[in-house]
């Protein structure tokens, strides 16, 4: 049979009901929430949909629904049933007596509920529906008579509405969240726009209807309001029309949200990436900088440390048991270490401890006046830029920290200690940042961001050929850290300024009251005139300013981080210029003052020079540490102390050697040999001396060693008498190198170099040891005279060249005197060379057997 044949149309409602009956034969739970189908008798029951029974916001996001549902939905189902009955009835038009809710099916995602009413026998379904709808509208009118409810409903109408369920409700809890757009799927013949409008308009304003087309078998209904689409979907879905030839299935069309911000970021990266980086940097500054500043202030003042409040009676309850426990553990560890050392080595403690504080004070009594001078300079508060100089091992750090600052209750409260040596020895940029942050108290610090920014910068440079500017150099990061530390120092310095201001105002008010009572007195000055400025306050209260102690400050170092010296010099100079803190530099490198001079060119630095301990103090210190005639004869102590001088490091090394079982002769001899080996390996080695980093002359070093082996010091002018030191640049370079490595030290008068002495007393004995060694003496003394011969030969060559030039002239009678002068110079230089050669021959005849004494030059 040919011709058009209508497709088979199944009845949606009957099919679903049959499927449910077939599937639920053995099930006990046949509720609508489980099966998704709401059964009802159309003759005796009606199903209505009430919207806004639940708050609508819970259906927006799953997280919001999960966390807010327990708070917003604390009402029970019985409460909601009663609420629906109250909304469906009025005093003027109550519901029939036998009307009751037989089933209440919540639909929380859509903020509504399906309510099944049993229709009383004396009432029809239509009458009951009309009565409920009219009562609901009347209740809404009464609700809006309240001005607040009326204004609220203008912006967001949350009063429930009621609609009859025309189709077969599908109660599902899928993640299909409500939207104003509905997709209409037709099972059978589709409906026209007019038919769709007629069917859906009752639920709210419709923005547009997109009917079925050849390319799209579904229709789209776009409502103006979300609640209209929700009501239409729950009431119309499953409806059968045209004599069950057409069935409608409705679904929400997800809202396609356009993120304009993300689109702008993706499409305009050249603008957005720098803007995002700037925003993140700003947020980081606003969030982390106050935290870092607080940690810096805590690091300097120890405001929140138990040690600060140890005298408080409440803190004592916790502090003293804690300190006792820590001391007990430390003493236990020391006891175990000492016993293990005695068992394995058979000897006692080899380390010099501080058990006898009087032994240490012997050395510091000589520096008492300098300690007083340092404190006086701090309290004078006049450009407090102090430099404490001294050789290594002279106790500069203890002098400043332990004996000057920590002995003063006011000064020790605000001390920031910076060790340049730890900063310079950092192996990487991140290590330098971490070490600096640790010493400043700068926390938190994120060094991993440097690696990420450098990686991104490298990638951008590879793609575009230009750097992105995201990464910062270590100098910039250090400057930022010092800048934040400056703010913290200012807050610390002015921490008591507000109290001073309030006290001044109170005193002024008291005087004002007295003046008002006594009319004869003249009015005093105003409060604002009496309160001094912050700068003047800091000038009058030097104890309020924090103290910056910079240790191991040098001119340069061998590492890649020597720029830290210049940065610290510039930073501390700005602190002194702004009168914000006292600055104390501790250095053994005289050349380091150049950085300070560059930072403060017009500033005269206050300098304290620390020398070694006196012979008497050194002798008493060593004997008090040994205090055992079996280890050393006290009568021969002077013999061994004299080569060591008063250098604390050498004295302690000598004591350790004796306590370890060496004799005094062996201990001193070994120390001198080590110093001699250090000198020959580093300074008298021609290979090392010719390197680019070594700017000294070996022959000059040998000549200076000979001077100092015979004398404690000598005049600087003595060097100018030797032709080897005629070149001032080379001479100054050699002297600077020797001073840096502590072989020599300078004495200046009015800033002018006057005398040269041995830097480390042990080196004087080493000089004598080397010169007393015939083999070493022959080697370097020969080299010394060869250098002198080279200088004289160069001089002769220049003079001969001058004679050759004069001889080429046509008339030389006017230059006769000049020729005679040059000739005499050549003869003198030649005679000098002959003398030097004779010296070399005499040196070559010396026996290479060494003398037994290093305390003098004795050749047999």
From Swiss-Prot:
Residues 180-255 form the RRM domain. The chain crosses the membrane at residues 271-291. One of its GO terms (cellular component) is mitochondrial inner membrane. Its main location: mitochondrion. It is a single-pass membrane protein. CDD domains: RRM_Yme2p_like. Residues 1-12 form a transit peptide. Keywords: Membrane, Mitochondrion, Mitochondrion inner membrane, mRNA processing, RNA-binding, Transit peptide, Transmembrane, Transmembrane helix. Residues 292-860 are mitochondrial intermembrane. The keyword Mitochondrion applies. One of its GO terms (molecular function) is RNA binding. Residues 13-270 are mitochondrial matrix. One of its GO terms (biological process) is mRNA processing. It is found in: Mitochondrion inner membrane. Belongs to the YME2 family. Plays a role in maintaining the mitochondrial genome and in controlling the mtDNA escape. Involved in the regulation of mtDNA nucleotide structure and number. May have a dispensable role in early maturation of pre-rRNA. This is Mitochondrial escape protein 2. It comes from Debaryomyces hansenii (strain ATCC 36239 / CBS 767 / BCRC 21394 / JCM 1990 / NBRC 0083 / IGC 2968) (Yeast). The gene is YME2.
């Amino acid at each position: 049979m040919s011709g058009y044949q209508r497709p088979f149309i199944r009845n949606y409602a009957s099919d679903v009901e049959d499927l449910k009956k077939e599937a639920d034969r053995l099930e006990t739970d046949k509720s609508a929430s489980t099966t998704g189908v709401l059964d009802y008798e159309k003759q005796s029951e009606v199903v209505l949909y009430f919207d806004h029974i639940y708050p609508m916001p819970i259906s927006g996001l799953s997280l919001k629904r999960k966390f807010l549902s327990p708070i917003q939905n604390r009402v029970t189902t019985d409460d909601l049933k009663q609420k629906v009955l109250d909304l469906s009835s009025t005093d003027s038009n109550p519901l029939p007596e036998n009307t009751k809710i037989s089933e209440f099916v919540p639909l929380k995602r859509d903020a509504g509920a399906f309510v099944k009413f049993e229709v009383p026998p004396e009432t029809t379904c239509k009458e009951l529906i009309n009565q409920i709808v009219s009562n609901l509208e009347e209740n809404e009118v009464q609700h809006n008579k309240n001005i607040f409810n009326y204004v609220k409903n203008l912006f967001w109408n949350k009063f429930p509405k009621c609609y009859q369920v025309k189709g077969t409700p599908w109660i599902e809890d899928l993640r299909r969240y409500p939207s104003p757009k509905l997709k209409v799927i037709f099972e059978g013949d589709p409906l026209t726009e007019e038919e769709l409008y007629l069917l859906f308009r009752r639920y709210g304003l419709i923005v547009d209807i997109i009917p079925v087309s050849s390319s799209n078998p579904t229709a789209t209904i776009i409502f103006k309001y979300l609640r209209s689409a929700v009501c239409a979907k729950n009431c119309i879905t499953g409806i059968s029309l045209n004599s069950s030839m057409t069935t409608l299935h409705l679904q929400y069309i997800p809202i396609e949200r356009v993120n304009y911000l993300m689109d702008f970021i993706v499409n305009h990266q050249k603008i957005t990436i720098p803007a995002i980086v700037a925003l993140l940097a700003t947020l980081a500054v606003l969030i982390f900088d106050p935290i870092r500043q607080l940690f810096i202030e805590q690091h300097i003042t120890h405001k929140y440390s138990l040690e600060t409040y140890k005298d408080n009676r409440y803190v004592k309850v916790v502090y003293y048991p804690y300190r006792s426990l820590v001391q007990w553990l430390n003493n236990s560890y020391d006891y175990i270490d000492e016993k293990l050392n005695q068992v394995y080595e058979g000897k006692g403690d080899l380390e010099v401890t501080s058990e006898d504080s009087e032994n240490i004070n012997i050395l510091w009594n000589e520096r008492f006046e300098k300690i007083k001078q340092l404190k006086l300079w701090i309290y004078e508060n006049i450009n407090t830029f102090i430099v404490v100089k001294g050789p290594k091992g002279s106790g500069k750090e203890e002098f400043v920290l332990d004996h000057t600052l920590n002995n003063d209750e006011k000064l020790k409260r605000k001390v920031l200690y910076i060790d340049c040596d730890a900063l310079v020895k950092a192996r990487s940029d991140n290590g330098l940042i971490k070490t600096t942050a640790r010493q400043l108290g700068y926390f938190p610090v994120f060094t991993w961001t440097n690696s990420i920014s450098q990686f991104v910068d490298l990638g951008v440079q590879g793609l575009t050929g230009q750097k992105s500017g995201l990464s910062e150099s270590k100098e910039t990061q250090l400057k930022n850290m010092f800048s934040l530390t400056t703010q913290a120092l200012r807050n610390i310095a002015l921490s008591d300024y507000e109290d001073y201001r309030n006290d001044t105002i109170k005193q002024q008010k008291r005087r004002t009251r007295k003046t008002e009572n006594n009319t004869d007195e003249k009015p005093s000055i105003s409060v604002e005139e009496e309160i001094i400025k912050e700068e003047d306050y800091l000038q009058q209260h030097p104890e309020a300013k924090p103290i910056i102690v910079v240790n191991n400050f040098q001119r340069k170092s061998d590492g890649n981080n020597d720029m830290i010296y210049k940065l610290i010099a510039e930073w501390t100079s700005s602190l002194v210029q702004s009168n914000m803190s006292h600055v104390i530099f501790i250095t053994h490198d005289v050349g380091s003052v150049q950085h300070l001079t560059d930072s403060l060119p017009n500033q005269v630095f206050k300098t304290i020079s620390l020398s070694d301990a006196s012979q008497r103090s050194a002798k008493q210190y060593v004997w008090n540490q040994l205090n055992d005639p079996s280890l050393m004869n006290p009568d021969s102590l002077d013999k061994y102390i004299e080569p060591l001088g008063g250098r604390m490091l050498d004295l302690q090394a000598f004591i350790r050697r004796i306590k370890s079982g060496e004799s005094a002769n062996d201990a001193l001899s070994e120390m001198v040999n080590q110093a001699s080996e250090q000198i020959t390996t580093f300074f008298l080695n021609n290979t090392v001396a010719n390197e680019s980093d070594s700017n000294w002359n070996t022959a000059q070093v040998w000549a200076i060693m000979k001077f100092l082996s015979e004398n404690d010091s000598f005049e600087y002018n003595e060097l100018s008498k030797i032709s080897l030191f005629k070149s001032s640049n080379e001479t100054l370079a050699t002297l600077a190198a020797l001073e840096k490595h502590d072989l020599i030290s300078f004495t200046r008068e009015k800033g002018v170099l006057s005398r040269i002495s041995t830097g480390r007393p042990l080196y004087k004995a080493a000089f004598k040891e080397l010169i007393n060694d015939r083999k070493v003496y022959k080697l370097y003394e020969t080299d010394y005279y060869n250098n002198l011969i080279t200088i004289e030969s160069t001089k002769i060559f220049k003079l001969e060249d001058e004679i050759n030039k004069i001889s080429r002239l046509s008339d030389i009678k006017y230059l006769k005197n000049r020729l005679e002068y040059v000739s005499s110079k050549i003869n003198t230089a030649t005679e000098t060379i002959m003398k030097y050669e004779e010296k070399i021959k005499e040196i070559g005849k010396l026996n290479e057997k060494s003398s037994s004494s290093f305390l003098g030059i004795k050749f047999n």
